[in-house]
Amino acid sequence: MAYRDQSLGELAIAIPRATKLFRELNLDFCCGGKQTLSRAAGKKDLNIDELEAQLEKLAAQPSDARDWREAPLADIIAYIIPRFHDRHREQLPELILMAEKVERVHHDKADCPHGLANQLTAIYNELSQHMMKEERILFPMIGQGMGANAAAPISVMEHEHDDAGRDVEVVKELTHGVVPPEGACNTWRALYSGINEFITDLMEHIHLENNLLFPRALRGE
């Protein structure tokens, strides 16, 4: 099957295991989910034929993941809030505390991620406001069947998703790709492991909203 002309977002929805492959190849399927596979692969100098073959194998594998394409929008929202919103509220404060400790204890080391705690704090503050607006304004509109009239708030949320994506790139730069240095202490390793988990969750979160919930809501489903 030819996948090259489909968008990354469409492929991530149709082939749930594709998200892991896209993350490994640094293909942005959440904020950049509207670009075609061919275009995204071209930007990264990836072999499109090999990439299509990999997706073909993934598509043939059985998956236990729920297919959200036909699920009621209220069910998607009911999944997003505890799985992602509440999880981010738990993750970030702990990551900030660990980042502060690592910066304090290892401030004199060359690989110390100076500024990481401040960057994570900024992400936490911005994401908290963002999620609150979704929960108080946008999600109730969608739940009441008013999604077709929600173009303005959806546009704002998508722009804030883009901002979150850029903030995550700063985190990656500060942490050398979120890879702990050789000999890093347990806290340092736990911090980077937690950041990687947060980034994975955030990408899945944005993907589900940008590529599935919002388009379906705008269509008046």
UniProtKB/Swiss-Prot annotation:
Keyword Cytoplasm: yes
Pfam families: Hemerythrin, ScdA_N
The protein's name: Iron-sulfur cluster repair protein YtfE
Domain of life of the native organism: Bacteria
Source organism of the structure: Pectobacterium carotovorum subsp. carotovorum (strain PC1)
Subunit structure comment from the entry: Homodimer.
Keywords: Cytoplasm, Iron, Metal-binding, Stress response
InterPro entries, alphabetized: FeS-repair_YftE (IPR023742), Hemerythrin-like (IPR012312), RIC_family (IPR019903)
Localization terms from the record: Cytoplasm
Gene3D superfamilies: nmb1532 protein domain like
Keyword Iron (UniProt): yes
MF-aspect GO terms: metal ion binding
Gene Ontology CC: one annotated term: cytoplasm
